[in-house]
Amino acid sequence: MSPISAEINPDAVLQFVDVTVRRGSATLLDRINWTVEEDERWAVLGPNGAGKTTLLQIAAAQLHPSAGEVYVLGERLGRVDVFELRPRIGLASSALSERIPGAEVVRDVVVSAGYSVLGRWREAYGRLDVRRAVGLLDRFGVGQFSERTFGTLSQGEKARVQIARALMTDPELLLLDEPAAGMDLGGREDLLRRLTRFADDPGAPASVLVTHHVEELPPGITHALLLRNGAVVAAGLARDVLADEPLSATFGLRLRVERSSGRWFARAVLD
């Protein structure tokens, strides 16, 4: 099935059907049709103001569209209890990170995801929950910070903790909002290596990764969606979409795109 088809797909992990979002006189998303299926790894790219954050908020069941239909894990937004749906969705974003108390212990930041709260819950956490949380922190290279407070971490370290938290509930859909933002080169490459290894796990969920930069995409991305001014420029297989013409149209600049060892790289074409 085409990822831009408006036909309802009952087996889709995520589907937008003619989705529009308006705020006052501004149109943030304009008639978006998009489908994510099982085992797909999507990248969403576009310049600032393209609508990427709005799209991710809807996918995370945190925002309802002004028009159109959204289906998340087989449930239609507006006809489902989002508080029951959200634990099935893993979300890592800088906006969520800003809401976490700085005094919160890193281990508890991750464990509390299983209780749908941001701070330490009133009950004592189970041993198995704590063990799983520490294991996820280890998996993303921040296990040594499990007893530290969240506010003492760097931006990149917080992003890794956010990913561990997003996976705590064993979600069916994983949403990552610019996970490599603010990282130095070494930190970015290490994170992408870990994300690639995670995506290779047979039990890994379908995922959507939002970024401004093709260089921040890990190998294993299968599909891409390009947004500009709230509208879809292109959507489909990554090898077709992450190419010179679609990316140039998306960013309003002539770009040359190359791929090496499963990674994408883009540079401006100088006249």
Residue positions per predicted region:
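ABC-family P-loop ATPase nucleotide-binding domains
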Residues: E98-T152
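H-loop (His-switch) and adjacent beta-strand-loop-beta switch element
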Residues: A224-L237
